[in-house]
């Protein structure tokens, strides 16, 4: 899998955005889809879980899909396999975030192009926790 081309400076600018909807956030504390957003929450980010199989995670209400989130979102952080990203991107575009962040190991060129064509920046194959803690 190729590396994301964003510079360190670009990543730092993205990490200044504080409202994050986390698609695929897990209730299981052993999974990255739980402990990464938990870390971000503990470090000042406003996390909104998006998971149709949960009602509450980290004492925050979960939403079934990204467009159900009532507030504006700066970043849509995705914890789903690459082959499941396209419908998530299509839904996220409707929410008009500034950035869609595909976590480490996630890359879908077709879906990423769709987001970029809609004016949304896309980070892929990078972990927000790792980037924030550098």
Question: What is each model feature region?
Answer:
Residues 43-45, 95-99, 118-120:
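A short helix->loop->beta-strand "cap" motif at the edges of active sites that frequently abuts
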Residues 16-19, 73:
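Phosphate-coordination loops involved in phosphoryl transfer and adenosine-cofactor binding
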Residues 66-104:
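Mid-chain, well-packed structural core segment of small domains
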Residues 57-60, 74, 110-113, 131-134:
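Short, charged, surface-exposed secondary-structure boundary motifs
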Residues 26-30, 37-58:
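NAD(P)-binding Rossmann-fold cofactor-contacting core
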Residues 104-132:
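Rossmann-fold NAD(P)-binding glycine/threonine-rich loop
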Residues 1-16:
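Short N-terminal or domain-adjacent regulatory/targeting segments
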Residues 21-23:
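Conserved beta-strand elements of the Class I
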């Amino acid at each position: 899998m190729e590396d994301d081309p964003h510079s360190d400076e670009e990543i730092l600018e993205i990490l200044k955005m504080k409202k994050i909807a986390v698609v695929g956030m897990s209730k299981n504390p052993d999974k990255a889809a739980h402990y990464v957003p938990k870390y971000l929450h503990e470090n000042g980010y406003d996390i909104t879980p998006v998971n149709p199989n949960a009602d509450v995670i980290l004492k925050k209400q979960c939403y079934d899909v990204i467009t159900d989130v009532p507030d504006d979102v700066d970043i849509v952080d995705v914890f789903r396999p690459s082959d499941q990203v396209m419908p998530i991107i299509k839904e996220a575009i409707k929410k008009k975030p500034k950035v869609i962040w595909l976590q480490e190991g996630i890359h879908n060129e077709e879906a990423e192009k769709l987001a970029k064509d809609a004016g949304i920046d896309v980070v892929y194959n990078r972990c927000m926790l790792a980037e924030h803690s550098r």
